[in-house]
Curated annotation (Swiss-Prot):
It comes from Lactobacillus acidophilus (strain ATCC 700396 / NCK56 / N2 / NCFM). This is tRNA (guanine-N(1)-)-methyltransferase. The gene is trmD. Specifically methylates guanosine-37 in various tRNAs. Disulfide bonds: none annotated. Keywords: Cytoplasm, Methyltransferase, S-adenosyl-L-methionine, Transferase, tRNA processing. The lineage of its organism: Bacteria, Bacillati, Bacillota, Bacilli, Lactobacillales. HAMAP family: TrmD. It catalyses: guanosine(37) in tRNA + S-adenosyl-L-methionine = N(1)-methylguanosine(37) in tRNA + S-adenosyl-L-homocysteine + H(+).
Amino acid sequence: MKINILTLFPDMFTPLQVSMLGRGLEDGKWDLNLVNFRDFTTDLHHHVDDTPYGGGAGMVLQIMPIKKALDSLPSTGKIIITAPQGKTFNEKMAQEWAKEDELTFICGHYEGFDQRVYDLADETVSIGDYVLTGGELPTMSMVDATVRLLPGILGNSASSVEESFSHGLLEYPQYTRPADFEGKKSARSFKPVVIIKRLLNGDTIRLLKATYLHRPDMLENRNLSDEEKKMLQEIKNEMNED
C-alpha cells in the first residue's frame, strides 16, 4: 500500500516511521509519501491561505496549491480529507481502507479548506467531536489504524483480528506476572457459574462483560445472537446481585 499525505508540517509524521510501522516501511510492506503543499505556491511569500469571501474570522486554505500537489502525484487512490464535519472514523473504515492499493490524505489547518477542496475528496472523515489545530494528528491516527492491518505489519497475524473493535466487542481485562502486586490479584472477577459458561462458550462472555461495563453503546450496534443475549442477561443479573 502507498500512502500520500498532503500537509504543511511533514515533520509531524516522524512517529509513523518508528516501531512496527517503521519496520514495515523498511521492509517495503507499505510506502509513505509526504508532500508539503506549500511547495506548490507561486507567490513570493508562499501563502497557502487567504481571507474568506464575505468576511469572517480566520483564514481559509486555498485550492490552488492543494490541487497542484495532487496533480503532481502519479496516482492518488482514494482521497481523504480530515475535518470536524466528516463522518466518524472507526475500525470498519480502517478495514476497508486496508484493502486499497493507495490512499491520499489532505491535512487541514486554520479555518479549514475552500469548499472546492472538499469537492476533490472521496471521503471527509473526523476522529471525534472535538477540534484540533490541524489534520495531522487525526491523519496519523487513521494511518496507524489502517496500516497495522496490512499483512506482515504486526508480529502476530491473529492480533489484528482478535482485538477490541474488530469483532464489535471490547477485549476483556488481561494480566501477566506477578499474580499479586501490592495486594491486587490477577484473578478474574467472575462467579463459578459464569466461569463454567465461559469454558463452554470460549471468551464470548468475558468480551460481553467488558463491553457492557465500558462501552455499552457498542452493544446497541451489534446483532447479538440468542446465546449472546442470554449471556448478557446473566451478566446484568450478576452485577445487580453485587
